Amino acid sequence: VSDYEISFKINTIAPMRICYHFLPKMAERGFGRIVKTTSGITLDPQQAGYSASKAALDKVTIDLGSKYEGTDVMINITDPGWCRTDLGGPHAPNAPESAIPGIVVGAFVDDKKSGRYLNAPFFTGMTLEDAVAKAERDFDSPYPKNE
């Protein structure tokens, strides 16, 4: 149980506190970007606490994003993919730096849509301009369209 507690404190509670601190200030200014890093780890019982904490982070991000949908305060999630890190191990197919375009793209999209789940490997090798265009075109917000 302690691994769940630690994972939730680090991966869910701490980012929530940061969001609840900064989001009102961003809303007052009329601009802000938050990009949270999630994980696609599944079916790994040894990582269950970690995976559950990231799933909770995803849910909180989508819920908070709905509050700011249509504004210039945007909250998105990015999954860096399986990278060669301490967690990913030496046999992971991706170098950590390969995830950079897919991580930073969430800070540069400008279409007032929050709650996107951006999969960093889809942006590998792209210029920032191309990555932003792809994110705005191919990664939609999870909220219903107001038409």
Where do the model's predicted regions map?
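Active-site-adjacent segment of SDR/Rossmann-fold oxidoreductases
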Residues: 26, 44-45, 63-73
